[in-house]
């Protein structure tokens, strides 16, 4: 769920969303990037659970209450460890000179969205 410019007043300066991540599954996937700064806040069930956040070429172990700032147009995606539900709240700032209007998938992952290319 996202609260973005499609449902917010034009004066809005933030895009806000939340994600419920199933155990062992990816989210914010395929990897993507955008020029605006973003921040993630994480919670887990059970609380001692964890996941991983990819940020560029770095991978961070994410735990209950952690915050992951995303800057510099870095590619990012998230995964919950098996056995742990992960929740995160994310927010992207709308700079006046560069408002958020979506993200860009990186190659070759954008092809994953074209179902005609999947052969089973």
Predicted regions and their residues:
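Coil-to-beta-strand transition motifs
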Residues: 11-12, 46-50, 84-86
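Active-site proximal loops enriched in glycine and acidic residues that flank catalytic Cys/His/Asp
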Residues: 55, 71-72, 90-93
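A short glycine-rich, His/Asp/Glu-containing loop-to-beta-strand
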Residues: 1-39
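Conserved metal-binding segment of the jelly-roll/cupin
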Residues: 62-83
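A short hydrophobic beta-strand segment most commonly corresponding to one strand
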Residues: 39-41, 84-102
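Short peripheral tails and domain-boundary helices/loops at the edges of structured domains
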Residues: 95-115
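Conserved small/polar residues in nucleotide/adenosyl-binding loops
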Residues: 118-120
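A short beta-strand-loop-beta hairpin characteristic of the jelly-roll/cupin
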Residues: 40-64
């Amino acid at each position: 769920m996202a609260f973005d410019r499609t449902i917010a007043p034009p004066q809005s300066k933030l895009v806000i969303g939340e994600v419920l991540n199933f155990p062992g599954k990816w989210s914010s996937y395929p990897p993507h990037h955008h020029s605006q700064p973003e921040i993630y806040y994480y919670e887990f069930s059970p609380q001692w659970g964890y996941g991983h956040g990819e940020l560029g070429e770095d991978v961070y172990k994410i735990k209950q209450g952690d915050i992951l700032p995303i800057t510099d147009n870095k590619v990012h995606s998230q995964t919950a460890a098996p056995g742990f539900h992960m929740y995160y709240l994310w927010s992207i700032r709308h700079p006046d000179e560069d408002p958020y209007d979506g993200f860009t998938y990186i190659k070759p992952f954008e092809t994953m969205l074209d179902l005609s290319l999947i052969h089973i």
